[in-house]
Amino acid sequence: VYRHINKYNNNYYICLCDDKPCGFIGEIDGDIRVCTDPEHQGNGVGSFMISEITKLRPHIYAKIKLDNISSIKAFEKAGYEKKYFLLEPKK
């Protein structure tokens, strides 16, 4: 994680909860990357970070796998809506 943030440090933000890192969010080529510490998941930290980065970069988007229900809920809570589906050949 830290190597990834260091490589794209102008595009990433660390979220603090009680002065300790509890998640990070960033953007690469318009695509949001977000991660919340498991101890803070389900407490609105993810949707808070999504809302805040959207204020800074209103034209970003998210690509989320259909089975990642918690991410879908966090983005919907932050005001995002489903727009497209990606279809891939069966493996």
Each predicted region: which residue ranges?
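Conserved beta-strand-loop-alpha-helix junction that forms the acyl-donor binding cleft
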Residues: 62-81, 88-90
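Conserved beta-hairpin
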Residues: 10-23
